[in-house]
A protein has these predicted regions:
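Short glycine-rich substrate-engagement loop in P-loop NTPases that contacts/grips substrate
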Residues: 23-27, 64-93, 104
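Conserved AAA+ ATPase "SRH/arginine-finger" region at the nucleotide-binding site
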Residues: 70-72, 142-155
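Conserved catalytic/switch belt of AAA+ P-loop NTPases
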Residues: 104-139
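Conserved AAA+ ATPase "sensor/coupling" helix adjacent to the nucleotide-binding pocket
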Residues: 140, 156-166, 195-199
Length: 268
């Protein structure tokens, strides 16, 4: 069975969800593709934010020969095969997943072909490339950061997924609950939706089904609601006011909600 996240993989940049600072009218990646020009790029950001989706859309819109390798799984010989194919057939795009794990041997064989333009790479990573990728590779790539998706973006993606699930019954509140579990990760949200759908005997996905599959109900069903921001504000005010008990209380609430990023930002 093909996963819902793979079924929904876009073939056009206009179908990419979120990342409006990179894709859309007048945005840098969309402009490059519109002009039929691509430089080697590294897309980095948290899981499920659209790195693979953007790479997929790029190669389909440019209609160029491409291959996909994983820097961990694929061996040096696999990279050699791609290079030989490019030598015979001409320009090629090489999508490299987990590019931050690419060892020196693989980097060394690629560098001359990046220099010549025979191979253009699209590197995908969850790690900050400024810290994790060899400068020799990094200096030959344009680096784009992807942001966690908003709750609204996740809901858009879930609704696209729902259209692919036959005879599903689900209400808007349940969709929001699934989105709230995702932490900006659309793939995670789609996987949860799919598990809930197939684990329900009548194809009815309710909040109770979601909770039984994924555990406790999140404290905030929607991180765009006022309660979430009121808690963040109260946490910061209690720190500024040196109210230890209140700060610890609101810290515990945010920890329970699972939002570590916002805690780090407020405490740094």
């Amino acid at each position: 069975m093909e996963l819902l996240a793979n079924i929904l993989r876009p073939e056009k940049l206009s179908d990419v969800i979120g990342q409006s600072h990179l894709v859309g009218d007048g945005k840098v990646i969309s402009n490059l593709i519109h002009n039929k020009v691509l430089f080697s790029v590294i897309l980095y950001g948290p899981p499920g934010t659209g790195k693979t989706s953007i790479a997929s859309a790029i190669v389909h819109e440019l209609n160029m020969t491409y291959r996909t390798l994983n820097a961990v799984v694929n061996k040096k010989e696999d990279f050699d095969i791609v290079i030989e194919e490019a030598k015979m057939n001409g320009l090629m795009i090489l999508v490299i997943d987990e590019i931050h794990r690419m060892n020196k041997d693989k980097q060394d064989i690629l560098l001359p072909y990046l220099e010549s333009g025979l191979i253009t790479i699209i590197g995908l990573t969850t790690s900050n490339p400024y810290h994790s990728i060899n400068p020799a590779i990094r200096s030959r790539c344009q680096i784009f950061e992807l942001k966690p998706l908003s709750t609204d973006d996740i809901i858009i993606g879930l609704k696209k997924g729902i259209q692919k699930l036959e005879d599903i019954t689900i209400d808007d509140d349940t969709i929001k609950v699934i989105a709230s579990y995702s932490n900006g990760d659309l793939r995670s949200a789609l996987n949860l939706l799919e598990v809930c759908y197939y684990s329900s005997s009548d194809k009815k996905v309710t909040k109770e089904v979601v909770t039984s599959v994924n555990g406790k109900v999140p404290l905030f069903a929607d991180k765009n609601d006022s309660g979430y921001y009121d808690t963040i504000s109260a946490f910061q005010k209690s720190i500024r006011g040196s109210d230890v008990d209140a700060a610890l209380y609101y810290l515990a609430v945010l920890l329970e909600a699972g939002d570590l990023d916002i805690i780090f930002r407020r405490m740094s």
